[in-house]
């Protein structure tokens, strides 16, 4: 891996963070097994803070030491560079932050698995969150990318989020986050720690039926038998990225250990031993061919994290 970053004025910034922050702190931690697609190099330092106080200490430390901070949720929708990630990679553990219920509002920790949010909702007799049943990753990551399906998205149910910075933490209304298709605007350096969902009382049995139908549809149309980060490109207005990638003859096309799925052409599957460079080669090829044939510039939905070579990113920029 590339040499670990060094913080200004500190011979070993990692030792300083280890000293200040309570929780799990791992040097040169492999990230591939912590992502859905099982690709990527190590983090200089991977931190899972023990509690909100430990997170506050971490955020102050990275600011004072000028160390980059990358937030990694459940590893879905993420491609980590083969060279890894410099600085600190932050993961919030499940159960991080106090949970609460007030009528139709649930407050849950950002580390909660997205696909299991319905369990908390149904236990409270609430519905309206059926779309999350098949979404991998964590609640915080789902909010950050406004994750969703054809039956709903996070902006439909999020009413407020708690943001932590080096200066403190507090709830902000969802309206201030500028939710849009597969994105939202988070303040620089802010970490989502808790999320307030506003749902509605309803028929839990009917909600379960809707979720099961959605799961069944995903199993039929998505490559869930191999590691994948989910949709690679966002759908352009009035069309579907998978249709376009298939139309230019790339469905099932392979580079190294990665392939465009022969089940759904907007999904890249790891056949075993894939590298980030393999995945990026597939993405560049698809974007180039679609642009040449249809005049459409596909936009990446997957989040690129870490130290990528400039040549690997050529052809992926707008």
Swiss-Prot record:
Protein family per UniProt: Belongs to the MurB family.
Alphabetical keyword list: Cell cycle, Cell division, Cell shape, Cell wall biogenesis/degradation, Cytoplasm, FAD, Flavoprotein, NADP, Oxidoreductase, Peptidoglycan synthesis
Keyword Metal-binding attributed: no
Major place of residence: cytoplasm
MF terms (GO), sorted A to Z: FAD binding; UDP-N-acetylmuramate dehydrogenase activity
Lineage: Bacteria, Pseudomonadati, Myxococcota, Myxococcia, Myxococcales
Organism encoding this protein: Anaeromyxobacter sp. (strain Fw109-5)
Ranges of Basic and acidic residues composition bias in the record: 214-223
Pathway named in the protein's UniProt entry: Cell wall biogenesis; peptidoglycan biosynthesis
Name of the featured protein: UDP-N-acetylenolpyruvoylglucosamine reductase
Span list, region Disordered: 214-235
EC code: 1.3.1.98
GO cellular component labels: cytosol
Domain FAD-binding PCMH-type: 39-202
Cofactors: FAD
Task of the protein: Cell wall formation.
Localisation: Cytoplasm
Catalytic activity: UDP-N-acetyl-alpha-D-muramate + NADP(+) = UDP-N-acetyl-3-O-(1-carboxyvinyl)-alpha-D-glucosamine + NADPH + H(+)
PROSITE patterns linked: FAD_PCMH
InterPro entries named in the record: FAD-bd_PCMH (IPR016166), FAD-bd_PCMH-like_sf (IPR036318), FAD-bd_PCMH_sub1 (IPR016167), FAD-bd_PCMH_sub2 (IPR016169), MurB (IPR003170), MurB_C (IPR011601), MurB_C_sf (IPR036635), Oxid_FAD_bind_N (IPR006094)
Record-annotated active site: 182, 231 (proton donor), 301
GO biological process: cell division; cell wall organization; peptidoglycan biosynthetic process; regulation of cell shape
Enzyme class per UniProt: oxidoreductase
């Amino acid at each position: 891996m590339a040499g670990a970053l060094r913080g200004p004025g500190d011979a070993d910034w990692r030792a300083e963070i280890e000293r200040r922050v309570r929780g799990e702190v791992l040097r040169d931690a492999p990230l591939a097994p912590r992502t859905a697609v099982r690709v990527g190099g190590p983090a200089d330092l991977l931190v899972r803070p023990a509690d909100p106080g430990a997170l506050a200490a971490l955020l102050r430390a990275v600011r004072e030491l000028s160390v980059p901070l990358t937030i990694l949720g459940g590893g879905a929708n993420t491609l980590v560079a083969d060279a890894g990630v410099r600085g600190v990679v932050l993961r919030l553990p499940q159960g991080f932050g106090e949970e609460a219920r007030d009528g139709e509002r649930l407050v849950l920790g950002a580390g909660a698995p997205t696909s299991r949010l319905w369990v908390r909702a149904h236990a409270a007799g609430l519905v309206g969150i059926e779309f999350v049943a098949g979404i991998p990753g964590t609640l915080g990551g789902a909010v950050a990318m406004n994750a969703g399906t054809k039956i709903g998205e996070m902006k439909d149910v999020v009413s407020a989020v708690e943001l932590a910075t080096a200066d403190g933490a507090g709830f902000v209304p969802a309206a201030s986050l500028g939710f849009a298709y597969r994105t939202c605007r988070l303040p620089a350096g802010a970490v989502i720690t808790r999320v307030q969902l506003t749902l509605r009382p309803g028929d839990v049995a009917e909600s379960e039926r809707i979720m099961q139908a959605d799961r069944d549809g995903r199993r039929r149309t998505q490559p869930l038998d191999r590691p994948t980060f989910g949709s690679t490109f966002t759908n352009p207005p009035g069309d579907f990225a998978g249709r376009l990638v298939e139309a230019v003859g790339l469905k099932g096309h392979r580079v190294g250990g990665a392939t465009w799925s022969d089940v759904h052409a907007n999904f890249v599957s790891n056949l075993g031993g894939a590298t980030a460079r393999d995945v990026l080669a597939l993405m560049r090829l698809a974007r180039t061919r679609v642009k040449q044939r249809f005049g459409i510039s596909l936009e990446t939905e997957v989040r690129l994290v870490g130290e990528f070579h400039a040549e690997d990113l050529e052809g992926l920029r707008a």
